[in-house]
């Protein structure tokens, strides 16, 4: 998706505040068959799911029949749902936050705590390590490793801005930051903690703040940054 498509999608999407309510009381007296509410009631206890503006009105109108409740709510007026992970041919660990309209290639790995925003692209065989942030439209190629805590900056506004592009076979070290509009060339390595403020050519190592080329990729560097395919393979039944 380009930036204008994303902006239009967010603007036109229905904003939602979903809630989950554990409820106790004289529940048989309440009409749960209402649009926007799903109820699972057994006797005088149950769980209901729905949009807060609908659920709150129903609960307010039936206060006398409700003895107690506990409400769970994790968002307000949310414009973008999370990505439906079923059917994605990749390893996605618990706690990763991936929004809708993200593309994930086959055999990619998304680790715990990673956050991937709308419009991002994760290439085949790429590993997104723990607590990585991939901003809107961030584009990462095939067989990359993005180290723990790294930030791939996103660009949705201004719409004319170019997103970050990480080409194939790139290794980004832990806690490195790649700023908006930067391209990191194929086969390069960004050292841990580096802040990348200008394009990186292919097959070099950059380090520092701001990041500068310190050497070309050699065999020693390749062995230290080897991508292990076994970590990315999925055993099919």
From Swiss-Prot:
The keyword Ribosomal protein does not apply. It comes from the Bacteria. Gene3D superfamilies: Hexapeptide repeat proteins (2.160.10.10), Malonyl-CoA ACP transacylase, ACP-binding (3.30.70.250). PROSITE patterns: HEXAPEP_TRANSFERASES. It holds the Pfam family Hexapep. Pathway: Amino-acid biosynthesis; L-lysine biosynthesis via DAP pathway; LL-2,6-diaminopimelate from (S)-tetrahydrodipicolinate (acetylase route): step 1/3. GO terms for molecular function: tetrahydrodipicolinate N-acetyltransferase activity. GO terms for biological process: diaminopimelate biosynthetic process; lysine biosynthetic process via diaminopimelate. Keywords: Acyltransferase, Amino-acid biosynthesis, Diaminopimelate biosynthesis, Lysine biosynthesis, Repeat, Transferase. Its EC number is 2.3.1.89. NCBIfam families: DapD_Ac. Catalyzes the transfer of an acetyl group from acetyl-CoA to tetrahydrodipicolinate. PANTHER family: 2,3,4,5-TETRAHYDROPYRIDINE-2,6-DICARBOXYLATE N-ACETYLTRANSFERASE, ACETYLTRANSFERASE. This is 2,3,4,5-tetrahydropyridine-2,6-dicarboxylate N-acetyltransferase.
């Amino acid at each position: 998706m380009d930036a204008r498509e994303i902006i239009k999608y967010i603007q036109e999407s229905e904003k939602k505040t979903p809630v989950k309510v554990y409820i106790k009381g004289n529940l048989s007296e309440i009409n749960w068959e209402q649009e926007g509410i799903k109820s699972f009631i057994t006797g005088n206890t149950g769980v209901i799911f729905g949009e807060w503006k609908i659920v709150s009105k129903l609960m307010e109108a039936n206060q006398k029949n409700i003895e107690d409740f506990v409400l769970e709510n994790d968002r307000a007026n949310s414009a973008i749902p999370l990505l439906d992970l079923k059917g994605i041919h990749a390893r996605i660990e618990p706690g990763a936050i991936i929004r809708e309209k993200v593309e994930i290639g086959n055999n990619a790995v998304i680790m715990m705590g990673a956050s991937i925003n709308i419009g991002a692209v994760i290439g085949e065989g790429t590993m997104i390590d723990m607590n990585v942030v991939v901003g809107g439209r961030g584009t990462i190629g095939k067989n990359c490793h993005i180290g723990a805590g790294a930030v791939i900056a996103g660009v949705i506004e201004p719409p004319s801005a170019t997103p970050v592009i990480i080409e194939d076979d790139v290794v980004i070290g832990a806690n490195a930051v790649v700023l908006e509009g930067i391209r990191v060339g194929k086969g390069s390595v960004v050292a841990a903690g580096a802040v990348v403020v200008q394009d990186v050519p292919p097959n070099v190592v950059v380090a520092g703040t701001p990041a500068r080329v310190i050497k070309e990729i050699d065999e020693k560097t390749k062995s230290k940054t080897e991508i292990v395919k076994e970590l990315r393979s999925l055993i099919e039944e």
